[in-house]
Amino acid sequence: GIIYPSDFIPLFERNGKICKLDLYVFTEVCRLISHWEKNGKEAVPVSVNLSRQHFTDEDFLEQFADIAQQYHIPAGMIEFELTESIFFENHQINRVGDAIKRMHELGFACSLDDFGSGFSSLGLLKEFDVDSIKLDRSFFLNMSGQKARDVIACLVDLAKRLKVKTVAEGIEDWGTVEYLRSIGCNMVQGYVFAGPL
């Protein structure tokens, strides 16, 4: 049967294999982008998750850069998704900031995933130079009230002021898509278009 990430990722984090898994996924993404481009297909930017365990090694990004170079991946084609949990380890805060700068130097984008699911999201936006925020699906579960819509509109407006793109996660209906379009949300993902690939 299907094994979901919520089942196997904690196991890989406990047994120390999560960094190898991230590198494997990254390599496969690079291979696919290269394959698409060689076959005349337009490649689209792809987001990959990055475990907080990578941040214990100051030079971890060089390995990712070497793989991207091996596959001739153009700058801007790969975005690293960071979750709020990466920022909770106080001794790693400086490393995370330095790593985000290095990501940009190497041609990678960086997003803050599941934005709004924790308590420190706004503070993170102030401190770290991310390219986009991915608004957590919990924002969109009950949008019948004006207050919920106002919160989302304020977040999108704040992101625009900071020159950060917004991505709405977990969208399941066209009414929400139209609302997000009307307030200027940059991108939408969810079952309204397709299931996970």
Predicted regions and their residues:
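Short beta-alpha junctions and helix-cap segments that line functional grooves
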Residues: 5, 93-99, 121
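Conserved, function-defining core regions and hallmark residues within catalytic/recognition domains
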Residues: 8
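Catalytic core of bacterial c-di-GMP phosphodiesterases, primarily the EAL and HD-GYP domains
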Residues: 16-95, 170
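Short helix-loop capping/hinge motifs at secondary-structure junctions, enriched
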Residues: 1-3, 35
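EAL-family c-di-GMP phosphodiesterase catalytic domain
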Residues: 1, 51-58, 70, 77-91, ...
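Alpha-helical scaffolding segments of alpha/beta enzyme cores, especially the outer helices
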Residues: 31, 62-66, 95-105, 150-157
